[in-house]
Amino acid sequence: MSNGLPISIGRPCTHDSQRSLSAPDSRIHSGFNSLLDTDLPMVHSEGTSTPTQLLRHPNIWFGNLPPPPRRPQDNRDFSPLHPLVFPGHHSQLRHVHETQQVQQTCPGKLKLSGAEELPPAPQRQHSLPLHITRPSRFPHHFHARRPDVLPSVPDHGPVLTETKPRTSVRQPRSATRGPSFRPILLPKVVHVHDDPPHSSLRPRGSRSRQLQPTVRRPLLAPNQFHSPRQPPPLSDDPGILGPRPLAPHSTRDPPPRPITPGPSNTHDLRPLSVLPRTSPRRGLLPNPRRHRTSTGHIPPTTTSRPTGPPSRLQRPVHLYQSSPHTPNFRPSSIRKDALLQTGPRLGHLERLGQPANLRTSERSPPTKRRLPRSSEPNRLPKPLPEATLAPSYRHRRPYPLLPNPPAALPSIAYTSSRGKIHHSLPKGALPKEGAPPPPRRLPSPAPRPQLPLRDLGRTPGFPTPPKTPTRTPESRITASPTDIAPLDSDPVLSVRTEVHAPERRTFMDPEALRSALASLPSPPRSVGIIHTAPQTVLPANPPSPTRHLPPTSPPWILQSPVGEDAIVDSEDDSISSFHSHDFDSPSGPLRSQSPSRFRLHLRSPSTSSGIEPWSPASYDYGSAPDTD
């Protein structure tokens, strides 16, 4: 810079406290360069302060200050990191600053005029300056929020000594100690007129709207016999489906109305209403401002009330004009054929509704069942419901299965706990006449594989199945082997008898069988005869759940072979036990000591030697626990 201070670092700073650099005049410009022959560091790192004692020392080296940029600073290259004020703020160097060119001014203009201040107020709590006169209109002034702070001054003559007004440079704007300089003007009093009940709060403004007087109508006494007019119920509205169908062999009746207490003659006493009557001409509205004329002397035009719906009933769909005096109000577009009418308009006949001219007798009867009916003829009612036989699980029945004595048992109706059905009791199943022997339990070897029973046919007479000799470790009781010979009626089944035993046949009525089965405790299992094909071989698994009982059967035969050579076997080796409850016998429950084991053989039509072993079965008439 030509006339400014050169900026460089590397020379010590000299200090001269005798000279003053307060006035940058041209007369001292030559001595200013000789005084500051060394350059002053103009850069000071922010955040660090240099003590004054170090700055006054003549041989202080400022080596830790960052260097300035290489090029000289101008008005366009100014870095805020390099302040222009000397960090020491020495009294000798306080007017030294970096500039583009040192301005030469007159020494007479160096003195700055001090800012004028407010004159000290004689009283700090005075409200107004001294040169402002108080208006005579408001002699008393108080604080806006604290009126007790400012006492009123009665005489202001000796206080106002200065006549020339002075403009103050600074005036407080806040009114914390006193009110503002502007005099407080009270708002104008708004007179609220309380004479009218509903007066406007703005008396100077015009009313936006005025209440119009209503039409004068004579006051009518309320009628005690009629309720006020109510809208028709929704049930009277026919809607888009039209009116409801009529009763058979009857004319159209008016829609039902809510029953209201009233006299029989409704023409003389009508409900009084303030609303005007509807105009007789369609499409014209009555004039509400026209006064009504009394029509009490005019007789009614019609003596009978029309049977159609009232005129206030709105029909949203059937907007067709008809004759005014028809008793049956029907649109002219409704055709007589119900199917043609409901097809294109209402869709499905049963789903969407019925036409207006359809009687109830013409409608199809509602279906009671949605399931399709089979074309097979009606069969005889089955004696027992279709249900599965007893499932194959090993447990004891909690209820007696058959009644006691065995003579009262129905023939061909023996079932086991595993769901197998037997047509006859084996030899020794029935107890002998006399006192029943005590029950006993016999151990037995491991159970043998068991097969389901075959159908023994429906013929009443077939030979008694003889018994197969079996031995037990304890009893050593033997019996004859059991085979089934061919029946007279069914050539498929055959029974081969090796040892004949006395047998007993008991004929029972099917009705007695049904009554005996119905007397069993609930829940009983299905008991009956298995019907299978003649050549069908049943699997060795438990019986299938699709077994059914025959609807009718010939006279039942109860075949109970009785003999001395009864077979005694273990209950563990048996299929099931029959438990009976004594209903009529005084002897109580009976238990057979000779559970029987028998096998049934099926002979095919081609060969008669085919024998299939039957699973052993035991019959227990006592209440001893079953281990099977």
UniProtKB/Swiss-Prot annotation:
Q: From what superkingdom does this record's organism come? A: Viruses
Keyword NADP on entry: no
Concerning InterPro entries, the annotation shows: 45/70kDa_tymovirus
Specify residue ranges for compositional bias: Polar residues: 320-331
What processes does the entry annotate via GO biological process terms? symbiont-mediated suppression of host innate immune response
Q: Which UniProt keywords apply?
A: Host-virus interaction, Inhibition of host innate immune response by virus, Suppressor of RNA silencing, Viral immunoevasion
Pfam families according to UniProt? Tymo_45kd_70kd
Compositional bias (Low complexity): 299-312
| Composition skew (Pro residues), residue ranges | 434-450
Location of the region described as Disordered in the Swiss-Prot/TrEMBL record: 1-25, 141-332, 346-404, 418-493, 535-628
Q: What does this protein do?
A: Acts as a suppressor of RNA-mediated gene silencing, also known as post-transcriptional gene silencing (PTGS), a mechanism of plant viral defense that limits the accumulation of viral RNAs.
**What does the sequence similarity comment in the record state about its family?**
Belongs to the tymoviridae protein p69 family.
Protein name, please?
A: 69 kDa protein
